[in-house]
Swiss-Prot record:
Entry-linked Gene3D superfamilies: YVTN repeat-like/Quinoprotein amine dehydrogenase (2.130.10.10)
Superkingdom of origin organism: Eukaryota
BP GO terms, sorted: cell division; exit from mitosis; mitotic cell cycle; regulation of chromosome segregation
Keyword Cell division: yes
Family according to the record: Belongs to the phosphatase 2A regulatory subunit B family.
Primary location class: cytoplasm
Name of this protein: Serine/threonine-protein phosphatase 2A 55 kDa regulatory subunit B delta isoform
Name of the encoding gene: ppp2r2d
Residues annotated as transmembrane: none
Keyword annotations: Cell cycle, Cell division, Cytoplasm, Mitosis, Repeat, WD repeat
The organism of origin for this protein: Xenopus tropicalis (Western clawed frog)
GO MF annotation: an example: enzyme-substrate adaptor activity
Length: 447
């Protein structure tokens, strides 16, 4: 797989944009999670209105070779509704926090979706036949008078227009006191974990009424609380290993073979802080917003406010690679603290071969880093460059007084336009980028 673009590498070009163009965006329409399935043929998004929209990849067409990166709506359903916790007098919003696909075992697809409190397992299946010729029912479903039935009929299957159904198969509720921030499916395909601010639970996909608490960092006295869990993920190949990150910038790797309760970690990853750069904001910007294992399982990647770090699982003392995402914002931390942007939770993702990584920034910019060449590129998700197959031009941010023609000044960045959620196709150079209520799909340019 090629690098991130620029130089002798391939270039990224526009494929599609989904969503309305309206200037006034309804809060419910803001995309809150993006996820490709294991084959990359399906792409799911969740939004703040509790809806899940699934897009299906178009089959490659010899007469339209550029359509290989096109996705069209496959299924839309309401996953979660707003609820009210009468015990705590709290509203539970319907926003979808995470979506995770299960590996496909048969013709149907399964995914997990979660809001702050409840996880649901959905089955997405196709129907293109219907049964006709029941003995006790008419074709429109009404019961027939038994005394008028004079012959025995054998029901037959008749073809019908393709219908995609989404049905909830399991509902996993009442296991989290705090807001769920992560779900991760295990490589055993039977269990998954869910994490909130203070606890991580292990579930079996077939059992909804109980889960095992595998991490609990809640202190006896809540005044002694110094950190919270920010993200958690299972290892892609070893079903006994998982990691979780904290608001203190640390990552703990746990092995469930050691003990049932994994409060004692097997490995502890932390980068020593440079005392000379310490400031009031140091702890806030070191909080990890996302952690992802590489597809190979050898590395993991963490995202904090200003950077992306790649860690070798065999080296706990410091990351092996550090990439600055928007270092030019370091001088703006005070104003970012005042407008609460400093608490934004950016996600990150690997490409299929682990050779490149992607994460979001402000002004609808997103960044890509090539791990082999150490080159990086800044691109923009914008309708201005949304002509079919339009090549994305690299963007540059300048901090000084003199600005070149193609540069944007750091003071001109729009902090309301932010790319928090991105996804990379598991095998191809196709990426999905969520920008407020719009989903942009880009692909590498076909020569």
């Amino acid at each position: 797989m090629a690098g991130v673009g620029g130089g002798n590498d391939f270039q990224w070009c526009f494929s599609q944009v989904k969503g309305a163009i309206d200037e006034d965006v309804a809060e419910a329409d803001i995309i809150s999670t993006v996820e490709f399935n294991c084959s990359g043929d399906l792409l799911a998004t969740g939004d703040k209105g509790g809806r899940v929209v699934i897009f299906q990849r178009e089959q490659e067409n010899k007469s339209r070779p550029h359509s290989r990166g096109e996705y069209n709506v496959y299924s839309t359903f309401q996953s979660h509704e707003p609820e009210f916790d009468y015990l705590k007098s709290l509203e539970i919003e319907e926003k979808i926090n995470k979506i995770r696909w299960l590996p496909q075992q048969n013709a149907a697809h399964f995914l997990l979706s979660t809001n702050d409190k409840t996880i649901k397992l959905w089955k997405i299946s196709e129907r293109d036949k219907r049964v006709e010729g029941y003995n006790l029912k008419d074709d429109d479903g009404r019961l027939r008078d038994p005394f008028r039935i004079t012959s025995l009929r054998v029901p037959i299957l008749k073809p019908m227009d393709l219908m995609v159904e989404a049905s909830p198969r399991r509902i996993f509720a009442n296991a989290h006191t705090y807001h769920i921030n992560s779900i991760s499916v295990n490589s055993d395909h039977e269990t998954y974990l869910s994490a909130d601010d203070l606890r991580i639970n292990l579930w079996h996909l077939e059992i909804t009424d109980r889960s095992f608490n595998i991490v609990d960092i809640k202190p006896a006295n809540m005044e002694e609380l110094t950190e919270v869990i920010t993200a958690a993920e299972f290892h892609p190949h070893h079903c006994n290993v998982f990691v979780y990150s904290s608001s203190k910038g640390t990552i703990r790797l746990c092995d469930m073979r050691d003990s049932a309760l994994c409060d004692r970690h097997s490995k502890f990853f932390e980068e020593p802080e440079d005392p000379s750069s310490r400031s009031f904001f140091s702890e806030i910007i070191s909080s990890i917003s996302d952690v992802k294992f590489s597809n190979s399982g050898r590395y993991m990647m963490t995202r904090d406010y200003l950077s992306v770090k790649v860690w070798d699982l065999n080296m706990e003392s410091r990351p092996v690679e550090t990439y600055q995402v928007h270092e030019y914002l370091r001088s703006k931390l005070c104003s970012l603290y005042e407008n609460d942007c400093i608490f934004d939770k950016f996600e990150c993702c690997w490409n299929g071969s682990d050779s490149a990584i992607m994460t979001g920034s402000y002004n609808n910019f997103f960044r890509m880093f090539d791990r082999n060449t150490r080159r990086d590129i800044t691109l923009e998700a914008s309708r201005e460059s949304s002509k079919p197959r339009a090549i994305l031009k690299p963007r540059k941010v300048c901090t000084g007084g003199k600005r070149k023609k193609d540069e944007i000044n750091v003071d001109s960045l729009d902090f309301n336009k932010k790319i928090l959620h991105t996804a990379w196709h598991p095998t191809d150079n196709i990426i999905a980028v969520a920008a407020t209520n719009n989903l942009y799909i880009f692909q590498d340019k076909v020569n």
